[in-house]
């Protein structure tokens, strides 16, 4: 919320730059902040796994007849609920400080669903990493070294046509940018549904790979005990 208020006020005049496609910077910024919030929140999902390992809870889970994928799905679902609630708060605050969503509630709902999809992917990756490293410090270092670079190497804060060409090139392969572009297109008018669906398809693929890695990582953990 602080990012929205401060950045929205500080860079208000950015929307006057030729080539900027939204009516206000707050309107442009909101989808980017929601996606940043999603990966920041989901990135810590693995901390719960580490706590369970230290307390011996994880070992009891692994000797029970529970599908390993269900453990990851439960963790990801918990994080998705949190992300949805946080995203709703940010969207409402955006309206309060002058933002506008031309596509209404439906567009905002699609944007939040995309954030949930991104968050579920990162929660699964966090769980996979936690099962491999099994240390808080290692997970904290990995999350903090990935979250902000992925955000700034996207179009979360600036129009793609206005960023350096190398950042625009990197953003093409950045899942955070996939979500930002799709969410912004869905919520802020002039929606390109082909673009939205294609980026959502990439995010679904990322989620499937992430969930598979998280499930397979239980084997690495079991071999270590």
Q: How would you label these PLM feature ranges?
A:
Residues 2-9, 25-97, 117, 126, ...:
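Hydrophobic alpha-helical transmembrane segments of multi-pass membrane transport proteins
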Residues 68-143, 193-215:
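Alpha-helical transmembrane segments and their short interhelical loops
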Residues 13-23, 99-103, 190-193:
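Short extramembrane helix-to-coil loop segments that connect adjacent transmembrane helices in Major
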Residues 1-24, 224:
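Hydrophobic alpha-helical transmembrane segments
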Residues 216-225:
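Short cytosolic juxtamembrane segments of multi-pass membrane proteins
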Residues 9-16, 51, 60, 64, ...:
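Transmembrane helix-loop junction
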Residues 152-209:
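Membrane-interfacial helix-loop-helix junctions in multi-pass membrane proteins
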Residues 9-13, 130-173, 177:
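Transmembrane helix segments
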């Amino acid at each position: 919320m602080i990012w929205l208020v401060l950045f929205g006020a500080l860079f208000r005049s950015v929307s006057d730059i030729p080539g900027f496609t939204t009516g206000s910077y707050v309107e442009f910024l909101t989808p980017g902040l929601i996606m940043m919030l999603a990966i920041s929140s989901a990135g810590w999902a693995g901390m719960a796994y580490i706590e369970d390992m230290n307390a011996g809870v994880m070992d009891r889970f692994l000797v029970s007849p529970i599908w390993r994928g269900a453990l990851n799905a439960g963790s990801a679902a918990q994080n998705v609920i949190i992300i949805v609630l946080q995203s709703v708060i940010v969207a409402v605050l955006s309206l309060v400080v002058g933002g506008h969503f031309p596509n209404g509630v439906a567009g905002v709902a699609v944007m939040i669903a995309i954030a949930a999809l991104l968050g579920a992917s990162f929660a699964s990756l966090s769980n996979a990493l936690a099962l491999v490293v099994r240390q808080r410090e290692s997970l904290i270092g990995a999350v903090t070294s990935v979250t902000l670079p992925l955000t700034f190497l996207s179009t979360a804060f600036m129009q793609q046509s206005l960023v350096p060409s190398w950042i625009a090139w990197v953003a093409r392969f950045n899942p955070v940018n996939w979500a930002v572009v799709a969410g912004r297109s869905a919520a802020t008018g002039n929606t390109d549904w082909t673009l939205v669906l294609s980026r959502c398809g990439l995010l679904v693929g990322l989620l499937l790979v992430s969930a598979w890695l998280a499930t397979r990582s239980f084997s690495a953990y079991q071999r270590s005990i």
